[in-house]
Amino acid sequence: MKPITILSLGVTLVLSMTSCNKFLDENPYSSLVDPDNASKIEKLLGSAYSTSSIAYLTELSSDNIQDDGVNNPYTNQFCEKAAYWETIVNSDGLYDAPYLIWQNTYNSIAHANEALEDIEALGGDKEELQGIKGEALLARAYGHFCLANLFCLPYDPSSSSTDPGIPYIKKRVVNLQPNYPRGTMAETYEQIAADQI
């Protein structure tokens, strides 16, 4: 090979191995919505509602269900799979599972928290932001309420200070696998009530 070709390959190789440390040290978290006005925060808040069908599990424990026995084509799904917390596939081929309810509800809570932080960054006391802030707080409280009802013991005032609750997330999630402490049922319901005021 010609010396110029070898030299240019060597220079290219050396330059390609250098990098900018500042770029690599930054957290890769980014928001899909640039929240610079109330309208964009409202659009973000549309993601603060869970896409999982909590009804698969909650209706079985209510009095809103009628037993049609073997004549019901969904008896197998609702009675057997939901009772054992297995994946349920509906008639459209879509599926839902308890772990997806947990994951999707916390994802919705993360969107509500992101909206709340963006509202504060814009000056949360503005009149146009108050309704959006109230909706975000209510969405966060509702998500935690659903999770507490599905994944915790029933609320009992006599043991709520010792019964384990759920992690109550109040900040934007920036870590890939965050580890949040699990409070008691009393703490969980106090925070749910505080978000509704």
Stretch-by-stretch model annotation:
Residues 1-29:
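Bacterial Sec-dependent N-terminal signal peptides
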Residues 20-65:
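Membrane-proximal, proline-rich intrinsically disordered regions
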Residues 31-35, 62-72, 153-162:
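Short, surface-exposed recognition loops and adjoining beta-strand edges that mediate ligand/DNA contacts
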Residues 53-58, 143-155:
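Secretory-pathway/luminal and periplasmic proteins that interact with or process carbohydrate-rich
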Residues 55-82:
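N-terminal capping/interface segment
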Residues 80-151, 179, 183-186, 197:
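Conserved, well-structured interaction surfaces
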Residues 150-190:
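Short coil/linker segments at helix-helix boundaries
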